[in-house]
Regions:
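ABC ATPase nucleotide-binding domains
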Residues: 72, 82-223
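Non-catalytic connector elements of ABC transporters
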Residues: 236-238, 246-349
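The feature captures the beta-strand-to-loop junction immediately N-terminal to the Walker
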Residues: 31-33
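Helix-to-loop junction immediately C-terminal to a conserved catalytic motif
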Residues: 46
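Conserved beta-strand
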Residues: 1, 11-23, 54
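Conserved ABC transporter NBD signature motif
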Residues: 54-62
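Conserved coupling/switch loops of ABC nucleotide-binding domains, chiefly the family-specific signature
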Residues: 52-55, 206
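Short beta-strand immediately N-terminal to the Walker A/P-loop
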Residues: 28-29, 75
Length: 349
């Protein structure tokens, strides 16, 4: 945990107390809105910030009070940090030169990293003359060139990168992770970056870790309504509802069978959540169906996005382009296995 003013009578946490284990060689993303504590967490790992409470362990060894240089951590910041008076080759070699590696070892390692990052043709160029994405690759390469780096921490590293290049760079990062088995921890507020890069995502809000899981877990079973809103485009559909006994609930006049036992939810306000990808357009009434009024149908390129209304509830439905959508009314079905029920905004398991 960390507070920037731990002596205050009304002390507020920038990072609430938590326990978490990071697996060596893993590929992680820390995802959340601005100011939620992402960078504070990253800076505690690297040693830039010392936590006001708790310990940081590497392989069981307490490193909480160690300096950044003693932790063998590489950190890539939002804006590229390079040595403009040096060539690309000299930039990549610099961490090894500082540790008095033999020249033959330095040359071999620089060539290996340059090949992994597609920088071979730029090694003799001045680093100051490169594009923003090339400079950021140099920053990353300086972290990878050392064999003793325990983890590479990246704080929104693609902010300055042209959108067309971001996908390619994320792919390169994944290839580097697979080749070197370096632990990569990537901070971002962009869900698309997190979902396409990470094996596991840590979702944060207001200094708290609200869910840790794979992209599929976060998408299919968000543990809070916040995660449901934050992950996905469009966000998860949510309907205020009431328990109707057993696994049944009611959304207005519609009766829905959910895959969750609701007998112990008590008096907490309930919401049903379901992704737009899982709602079906059907031809006839049946289990878990209701009739909604079509507001608009948008062609999104590789799919259609239907916006419909049922008794005041706005519903987003993704359908394949070749599916015909009625102009006025549509019968919608909510499959029970895809329904998530939330009591006081927390997933009922």
């Amino acid at each position: 945990a960390h507070s920037y003013n731990p002596q205050a009578a009304d002390m507020a946490y920038a990072l609430d107390p938590f326990n978490m284990t990071w697996v060596d060689g893993g590929r992680y993303a820390i995802l959340g809105p601005s100011g939620c504590g992402k960078t504070t967490m990253l800076n505690i790992m690297s040693g830039i910030v010392q936590p006001s409470e708790g310990k940081l362990l590497f392989d069981g060894v307490d490193v909480t009070t160690l300096s950044t240089s003693e932790r063998n951590i590489a950190q890539v910041f939002q804006f590229p940090v390079i040595y403009g008076t040096m060539s690309v080759e000299q930039n990549l070699a610099f961490p090894l030169v500082c540790r008095n590696y033999e020249k033959s070892v330095i040359d071999a390692k620089v060539q290996e990293v340059a090949e992994a990052l597609s920088l071979q043709g730029l090694l003799k160029k001045s680093a100051s003359r490169l594009t923003a994405d090339q400079k950021q690759l140099i920053s990353l390469g300086r972290g990878l060139v050392r064999d003793d780096v325990a983890a590479v921490l990246m704080d929104e590293p693609l902010t300055v990168i042209d959108p067309d290049l971001k996908f390619r760079l994320r792919r390169q990062l994944k290839e580097i992770n697979q080749k070197y088995r370096s632990t990569l921890i990537y901070v971002t507020h962009d869900q698309n970056e997190a979902m396409t890069f990470a094996e596991n995502i840590i979702v944060m809000d207001a200094g708290k870790i609200v869910q840790v899981g794979s992209p599929a877990e976060l998408f299919d079973r968000p543990k809070t309504t916040f995660v449901g809103y934050f992950i996905g485009a469009p966000a998860m559909n949510f309907f205020e509802c009431q328990a109707a006994g057993g696994h049944k609930l009611s959304i207005g006049s519609a009766e829905i069978m959910a895959g969750t036992d609701l007998s112990k939810v008590g008096s907490a306000p309930l919401k049903l959540g379901i992704r737009s990808e899982y709602i079906r357009i059907v031809e006839a009434k049946g289990a878990n169906t209701f009739t909604a009024q079509v507001q608009r149908v948008e062609d999104m390129g590789n799919y259609k996005l239907v916006t419909a209304v049922f008794e005041g509830h706005v519903i987003k439905v993704k359908v394949e382009r070749d599916i015909a959508v009625p102009a006025d009314r549509v019968e919608l079905q909510l499959p029970a296995e895809n329904c998530c029920v939330y009591a006081a905004d927390i997933l009922v398991s």
